[in-house]
UniProtKB/Swiss-Prot annotation:
GO MF annotation, one: glucan endo-1,3-beta-D-glucosidase activity
Function: Is thought to be an important plant defense-related product against fungal pathogens.
Listed GO CC annotations: vacuole
Official protein name in the record: Glucan endo-1,3-beta-glucosidase, basic isoform 2
Modified residues (Pyrrolidone carboxylic acid): Q26
Similarity field: Belongs to the glycosyl hydrolase 17 family.
Induction statement: In leaves, in response to infection, elicitor, ethylene, or wounding.
Any matching Pfam family: Glyco_hydro_17
Keywords of the record: Glycoprotein, Glycosidase, Hydrolase, Plant defense, Pyrrolidone carboxylic acid, Signal, Vacuole
EC number: 3.2.1.39
Species the sequence originates in: Solanum tuberosum (Potato)
Residues in the signal sequence: 1-25
EC class: hydrolase
Amino acid sequence: MATSQIAVIVLLGLLVATNIHITEAQLGVCYGMMGNNLPSHSEVIQLYKSRNIGRLRLYDPNQGALNALRGSNIEVILGLPNVDVKHIASGMEHARWWVQKNVKDFWPDVKIKYIAVGNEISPVTGTSSLTSFQVPALVNIYKAVGEAGLGNDIKVSTSVDMTLIGNSYPPSQGSFRNDVRWFTDPIVGFLRDTRAPLLVNIYPYFSYSGNPGQISLPYALFTAPNVVVQDGSRQYRNLFDAMLDSVYAAMERTGGGSVGIVVSECGWPSAGAFGATQDNAATYLRNLIQHAKEGSPRKPGPIETYIFAMFDENNKNPELEKHFGLFSPNKQPKYNLNFGVSERVWDISAETNSTASSLISEM
């Protein structure tokens, strides 16, 4: 067999292995826009494609971003922002209009996978005034998606944070706060009945920075050399798994044992507060990318995970919120991250076949 043919076969094998590797990871990146110096929407989507980032979270139905996503084959979590939740809950006509304008008009050119109705609405935060509208808005959007003929393609959910969890230690004893059960139980029931996952924002950084005396940095960064928490037969070496499994346990306690979880935000700031350093962020992100393929002790298997965020956003507050980006606004990577392909594979593909240029290079 000719050397060139062997090289092509080897390359194809590497490409197949690469695609499996990235699929296992199920990684996405959140596309926030709270900056006055960010690239154009088309540049951003091209950056996702060039880095082989196949999933994206969008916090509102920005028409420029949705148009840029046409034909990209990137899977999208499309946000219905908190400011619209009350309006959507007030009547089906509003839900139908929203779905037509922001979903149906872009389908199937834009691969919307989930609609996140609200972000971190909670009875115990500044969004408490919206809590009574959360489930009605979920139901109305769900019905509107079904009426649009997309009920088998798009799941409707909401994104929550860890403030709803009352007990998280040990993870098997995870439970929702008693004073929010009136809010969380109907959400879990809705997701169970519609077979949709709960979207959860999980930040080991905030748990660590708020309690460094009790939580070690290695445990938060996935670098603990030994088991930190023994929970029955389950062993925990990192805080991410412990937090994730506490939510699974909480849902099981409320009849949601069949409900999956998508980690809809997860990141580490590089500046602006205690523990927020370039080195810590790089370590956390590299390990998160690797760990997303593996699953947690309670739920082994790939974890669909969205890293927060694509860019540093200079209009956010407080200061540390400005420093969660994987990239600077000039599109230069802040970290040497790898979404599943080694530099060697990139070099081989570039030398052997120009059509492999879509392979991800190291970030």
